[in-house]
């Protein structure tokens, strides 16, 4: 009985990990990028990012300016997800490409 319970838990964790990675790959109008440079201009944060899916050293470079308070996770070298709502508003969130499993 214990083996069946352990097997069920391990299987559900594995499936949850796979579904999380699947959803991260298909996130709509966005892309993954690596932060190359960050600078505050008043209350706006200007980020220079490379659209490289956080995997390659090459890719197009984009400068993004957002109104954002200080966030210690948006540092140079961090992998971020940039979402665009097609109206000029962009949302930046950190993304960890390493799977915890």
From Swiss-Prot:
A lipid is attached at residue 18 (N-palmitoyl cysteine). Residues 1-17 form the signal peptide. It comes from the Bacteria. This is Uncharacterized lipoprotein PM0553. Its main location: membrane. Keywords: Cell membrane, Lipoprotein, Membrane, Palmitate, Signal. A lipid is attached at residue 18 (S-diacylglycerol cysteine). GO terms for cellular component: plasma membrane. It comes from Pasteurella multocida (strain Pm70). It is found in: Cell membrane. It is a lipid-anchor.
């Amino acid at each position: 009985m214990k083996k069946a319970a352990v097997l069920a838990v391990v299987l559900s964790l594995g499936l949850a990990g796979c579904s999380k990675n699947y959803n991260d790959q298909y996130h709509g109008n966005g892309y993954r990028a690596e932060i190359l440079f960050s600078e505050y201009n008043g209350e706006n944060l200007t980020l220079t990012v490379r659209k490289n899916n956080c995997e390659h050293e090459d890719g197009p470079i984009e400068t993004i300016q957002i109104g954002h308070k200080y966030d210690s996770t948006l540092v140079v070298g961090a992998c971020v997800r940039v979402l665009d709502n097609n109206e000029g508003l962009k949302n930046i969130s950190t993304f960890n490409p390493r799977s915890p499993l």
